[in-house]
Amino acid sequence: IYGATLVGSPFIGIGFNDYLGWAHTNNVHDGQDLYKLVLVDGGYKWGDDSKPFAIRTVKLKVRGADGVLSEKELTIKESVHGPIVREDEDYAYALRVVGQDQPYIFEQYLEMALAKNFNEFQKAASRLQNPFFTTMYADRDGRIMHLFGGRTPVRPAGDWDWLGTVPGDTPQTLWQDTHTYTELPKVIDAKSGWLQNANDPPWTTTLPRELDRRDYPDYMSRNFMHFRAQRSARMAYEDDKITFQELLAYKMDTRMELADRLVDDLVEAAESSDDKFLHKAAAV
């Protein structure tokens, strides 16, 4: 297995072997929620009743400037949502994050690295022990896959507004489960023969589109395609057969979609200006 580790990870996070390879990008993914709790009677409002906070103390070893370790106590206050990260006179804010009960990420990545075909790799990836990331896969048999991976909470309703502060005084907003592997957006063996992703949502990983956003909850991911992804998709879409050397050139491409759309208008505006400096800029 060859590849690179991600910062802080003692395993190959992006890699390849004699049979297949994979890479990751950041998926536009909401795997956490910040709940606003109403403080009452030393606890917090919960439906028509109230609940007390759970309080525990942990001991941490902290290395000082002199290199000596000292023991510090940290008091953690929790609601049913998760730990309290902020509190004022009337409200407290609790953070709920996916992945707290997924301790087998090392096993998953070892299985991915040892896989010899698509089925073996997919079996490993379907464990979803990594709470986020898009996975882009290709193998020597010509199979390709885009997986919008990680753990996405099964929310009762709503859209991307869950990215903001969520009312925490009702059981109706508290999610318990996450979407299964089969429920996540993915494109396997795209008809176009190519996939791309540049830290953007999964809907335009290939063109023509093979994912319909309406088949998924509105909170699954946002709906946009930024300029970097547009440039990536354009290069693949406009080339029927990409050679390895072309692929390397596309990888290092510095042309900007935004510039292509604005330069002509900017030059025209500069040339019509009374500012001689802008005339020089337009000439360049």
What residues fall within each predicted segment?
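Mature extracytoplasmic enzyme cores
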Residues: I1-A283
